[in-house]
Structures are given as structure tokens and as C-alpha cells.
Amino acid sequence: MRDKTGPKFGPYQPDDEAVSPSRRRLILGMGMVSGALVLGGAKTAQAADCRSPDVAGTQDERWQKQPFYGQHQAGVLTPQQAAMMLVAFDVLATDKTSLIRLFKLLTERLAFLTTGGRAPSVNAKLPPLDSGIMGPEIYPDNLTVTVSVGNALFDERFGLQGQKPLRLQRMTRFPNDSLDAGLCHGDVMLQICANTNETVIHALRDIIKHTPDLLSVRWKREGFISAHAARSKGQDTPINLLGFKDGTANPKISNKPLINNVVWVSNNAGEPAWAVGGSYQVVRIIRFKVEFWDRTPLQEQQTIFGRDKNSGAPLGMQHEHDEPNYAKDPEGKVIPMDAHIRLANPRTIETQRNLMLRRGYSYSLGVSNSGQLDMGLLFVCYQSDLAQAFLTVQERLNGEALEEYVKPIGGGYFFTLPGVADANHYLAQSLLEA
């Protein structure tokens, strides 16, 4: 018998997806003042020559870098870095011209931050142009900043209604959700990842400093995976805070035809032309009832997931990446019918179209007001079709045994922009000039 006592969560509170006009005006006014201070300083520094020093025959991790330019943005197929932050913003821009300025500025800053360089110096009577938390040298540190846009950006403010991706929608409540209005939605979502927390925080502060009249933080959450998993560059599956491997069934990045089908919007998808090369991003903040879970017998934990806790192998099998054969277990005697892995991926020809690429991170925020540990999973996944992938899978998962131990409290649906071809282009250019 499972202990039914566990953390209590408040009811879902309906909220407006976009920031209210009055709040936007207030923040905009504040931003223009601070923006004047920033613009009074020196121009943006040019990226320095970031040659990799020879450190004991291996590259210093601080100098690791991911390409900024390309058909797709980095941070989707990139092997997971150790540190991550999700930051949702409300856009303060009031017209399309200002919105274009925002995305050009984001492109400029991200190109610099992901390359690295020397922090610029200014007159000491002016605010410094860099926070200084990384010292005088800004290392790339494997930084990626993946930019996505929310459903609300396609409202009447910028005249983009006709360019909205077909499947993009406001995240609605599932039966087990207890959504906090302050942790949902956003006009722009940044997924910031790097080797270290310092680099992630530095990137966020740089972006905020340079966009005071254009962006306002709506909510943020910081996540992590083990250093061992990060250094494996995708070879070792991260372990979540319930003690189980998370992401075992991901499609292999090396299988390019499969990845192109699962992750990226293609020319024949019926989407707006600008969206080709982008991806639908799902973000879910999922709180774990870890005290409750830690009192649950191991056998029950394993039947809930359908996997061995140590090896990650499907029950009745030996290795993590062994594929379960549900046809030989039609009554669920080995892997229960309501096991997480069986519901999420039934392994049929029909359900192959429901695949997605997961890129989740753990989070830990201290304790709740009731004295319970506030920790869980920052679930992030990418797919070429939101309805066919995440939404379909989540419908199958409704009512699963795992729901007793987890509670989604926030997040949103976003569209990850196509990549930037080169230094002559900018993020969202094909959308804004469509």
C-alpha cells in the first residue's frame, strides 16, 4: 500500500499570457533610464583571439566553444552541459521596429558571449559594461543560448498573427498539473547552458544589461546535471532526483535522418516558410515529492518507471538501451501496463511518430513553506510537431502511477528559432521580414 500523504500543492490560477500593458509601461520607463546609462558607455567590445592554451595536453574547459552560426541553433543537439538556466521574458518593445532591434541586439550579444573575449574597460565614472564575475577575460566555457518565442509574441502588438507556427499554442492544464501563474509562458524563452553556473549567470546579466527597454524577466529556473554526465558528452544518461536515468529512449543524435524528422521543422510540414529549421520547445517545471518517494519500496519504484534503478535496463532485461518487447508481455506481468516507459513509448510502428528529443535538468531550490524539499525536473524537449509528439505522449501519461510523486507547476510551449546563417544575418530575421 502506498503512503498517500505527500506535499500539498495549490490550485491552478488562470493568468494572462502576455504582461499587462500597465506593467509593461512601468517596466519600460524604468528600463529607459538604465538604458541611457548603458548607452553612455563604450561600444560593445570585439571578440578577442580565443586561442586554446595547451593545458597538460588537453584543452582547458573554459575555452570550449560551440558554433553560434549555422542552420540550427546550438543547445538543441549539443551534448548537455553541466549548468543550465531557463529564463522567460516579457517583451517591452512596442512596435515591430523595436522588436527587430531586440533580436539584432540579442544576436550581437550571443555571438560575442559564445566566442569569448576581453571585457571592455570604460571611464570609471560610468557603469562598467560587464559584470566582472568572470574576471577580465570572458571565456566561452561551452556556452549556448537557445532562443525561442512564445505564443503571445504572435498577438496584435507586432502584426505577426499570420506568421505563427501552426502548432504553437498556450500551455493549458493537464489533470495532474498545479500551475503557478508566475511560472508560466513568456514572449521569449532563453535556454542558457554552459560548463559552469558562473558562465550561465554572466550571460543572463549581460543580456539584461543590454536590453533594459526591450525585455523584462518573467520567471527563471536554474538546473544541473552531474559533471560526470556532462563530461561524457551524451554517452552517459543523466540521473534525475528520483534516482532514475532520464532520457534513455532519446533518438540517437548520430542518426541524422531520424533527428531531422523528429526535431526540425521541414519544408513539407505546411509551416510558415520562416519556421523551417526551427523546432517546437516544451518546458515543464515538475516538482518531485522526494520525501514521499524515498519512503517507497525499491520494487515499487522500479515498476512505476518500468526500469531497473541501477542499470536503467527495462525490467526483465540486462542493459540500459535494450528495447523492451511488449508483444511478448501483453498483460504487463514484467513491465506493468501503466509503467512510465510503456505509456510514454509503446514501441509500435504507429507511435514512432510521437518521438521527441528530451534535454532535461534537475533543480533544487531549498525548502517549501511547509518544510519540504523543493526540487525536481526542468523537463525540456524538442520536436518538429508539438501535437504529434509531446501532447500525444502526455495524453497517454495522464493517470500514470508516477503522478502520485510528481507535480508539474509551470513552464510553457515555445518555438525555437532557426539558426543564424552568418554575421550578416540575425535571429528571427526570416520571421520579422516575412
UniProtKB/Swiss-Prot annotation:
<feature type="binding site">
    <location>
        <position position="358"/>
    </location>
    <ligand>
        <name>heme b</name>
    </ligand>
</feature>
<dbReference type="InterPro" id="IPR006314">
    <property type="entry name" value="Dyp_peroxidase"/>
</dbReference>
<dbReference type="Pfam" id="PF20628">
    <property type="entry name" value="Dyp_perox_C"/>
</dbReference>
<keyword id="KW-0732">Signal</keyword>
<dbReference type="GO" id="GO:0004325">
    <property type="term" value="F:ferrochelatase activity"/>
</dbReference>
<feature type="binding site" description="proximal binding residue">
    <location>
        <position position="340"/>
    </location>
    <ligand>
        <name>heme b</name>
    </ligand>
</feature>
<feature type="signal peptide" description="Tat-type signal">
    <location>
        <begin position="1"/>
        <end position="45"/>
    </location>
</feature>
<feature type="binding site">
    <location>
        <begin position="345"/>
        <end position="347"/>
    </location>
    <ligand>
        <name>heme b</name>
    </ligand>
</feature>
<keyword id="KW-0456">Lyase</keyword>
<dbReference type="Pfam" id="PF04261">
    <property type="entry name" value="Dyp_perox_N"/>
</dbReference>
<protein>
    <recommendedName>
        <fullName>Deferrochelatase</fullName>
        <ecNumber>4.98.1.1</ecNumber>
        <ecNumber>1.11.1.-</ecNumber>
    </recommendedName>
</protein>
<keyword id="KW-0349">Heme</keyword>
<feature type="binding site">
    <location>
        <begin position="247"/>
        <end position="249"/>
    </location>
    <ligand>
        <name>heme b</name>
    </ligand>
</feature>
<dbReference type="InterPro" id="IPR006313">
    <property type="entry name" value="EfeB/EfeN"/>
</dbReference>
<dbReference type="InterPro" id="IPR011008">
    <property type="entry name" value="Dimeric_a/b-barrel"/>
</dbReference>
<keyword id="KW-0574">Periplasm</keyword>
<keyword id="KW-0560">Oxidoreductase</keyword>
<comment type="subunit">
    <text>Homodimer. Part of a ferrous iron transporter composed of EfeU, EfeO and EfeB.</text>
</comment>
<keyword id="KW-0575">Peroxidase</keyword>
<dbReference type="GO" id="GO:0004601">
    <property type="term" value="F:peroxidase activity"/>
</dbReference>
<comment type="function">
    <text>Involved in the recovery of exogenous heme iron. Extracts iron from heme while preserving the protoporphyrin ring intact.</text>
</comment>
<dbReference type="GO" id="GO:0005829">
    <property type="term" value="C:cytosol"/>
</dbReference>
<dbReference type="GO" id="GO:0046872">
    <property type="term" value="F:metal ion binding"/>
</dbReference>
<dbReference type="GO" id="GO:0020037">
    <property type="term" value="F:heme binding"/>
</dbReference>
<dbReference type="InterPro" id="IPR048328">
    <property type="entry name" value="Dyp_perox_C"/>
</dbReference>
<keyword id="KW-0479">Metal-binding</keyword>
<dbReference type="InterPro" id="IPR006311">
    <property type="entry name" value="TAT_signal"/>
</dbReference>
<comment type="similarity">
    <text>Belongs to the DyP-type peroxidase family. EfeB subfamily.</text>
</comment>
<dbReference type="GO" id="GO:0033212">
    <property type="term" value="P:iron import into cell"/>
</dbReference>
<keyword id="KW-0408">Iron</keyword>
<dbReference type="InterPro" id="IPR048327">
    <property type="entry name" value="Dyp_perox_N"/>
</dbReference>
<dbReference type="GO" id="GO:0042597">
    <property type="term" value="C:periplasmic space"/>
</dbReference>
